[in-house]
Regions:
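Short beta-strand scaffold positions
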Residues: 5, 36-37, 70, 90, ...
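Active-site-proximal, substrate-binding regions of enzyme catalytic domains
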Residues: 39-70
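Active-site phosphate/pyrophosphate-handling residues
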Residues: 8, 46, 89, 93-97
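Short, well-structured N-terminal submotif of metal-dependent ribonuclease cores
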Residues: 1-36, 49-59, 122-125, 130-133
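Short active-site oxyanion
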Residues: 1, 31-35, 65-67, 101-106
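Alpha-helix/helix-capping structural signal
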Residues: 8-9, 40-43, 113
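Acidic, PIN/NYN-like endoribonuclease modules and their adjacent C-terminal/linker elements
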Residues: 96, 102-133
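Acidic catalytic patch
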Residues: 16, 64-86
């Protein structure tokens, strides 16, 4: 199975001073499924990692295959439709499109308000990870 990974999870893992660092670190060591993201989210990750002085750590994770980056022929079209429909950034919309493409309802994010208000193509709510508890 796959879980779609949002930028804030990766930033929290890289930045020990991030308010969500401990929660992200506890979650990541218990998770064994494929962690997948999009090039749009990766660009955000790169930007924030650079700002936090963690760019090399992010690049090492990418080289080791910690995260898989997926894109497909009509990804941009799907992303634009979702972004307009839900007033999302292109990065966030691309993650929703990716979840649909992978047929997963699991998104790793600390942005519960935004992703918790969205549903899968089948109309089911996304499972937001890590658990709020």
């Amino acid at each position: 199975m796959s879980v779609v990974v949002d930028t804030d999870i990766v930033v929290a893992l890289l930045d020990t001073g991030d308010a969500n660092h401990e929660a992200a670190a506890r979650w990541i060591v218990t998770y064994d499924d494929d962690l997948v993201t999009t090039p749009l989210a990766l660009a955000e990750m790169d930007h924030f990692a650079r700002c936090e002085g963690a760019l090399e750590a992010l690049r090492r994770d990418l080289e080791r295959g910690v995260y898989t980056v997926r894109w497909w022929a009509d990804a941009l079209d799907e992303t634009l439709v979702i972004a307009r429909r839900h007033d999302l950034s292109l990065a966030d919309a691309s993650l929703v499109a990716l979840a649909d493409r992978l047929r997963t309802d699991r998104i790793a994010t600390f942005d519960r308000a935004r992703f918790g208000a969205l549903t899968t193509r089948a109309g089911m709510p996304f499972t937001i990870l890590p658990d709020a508890g």
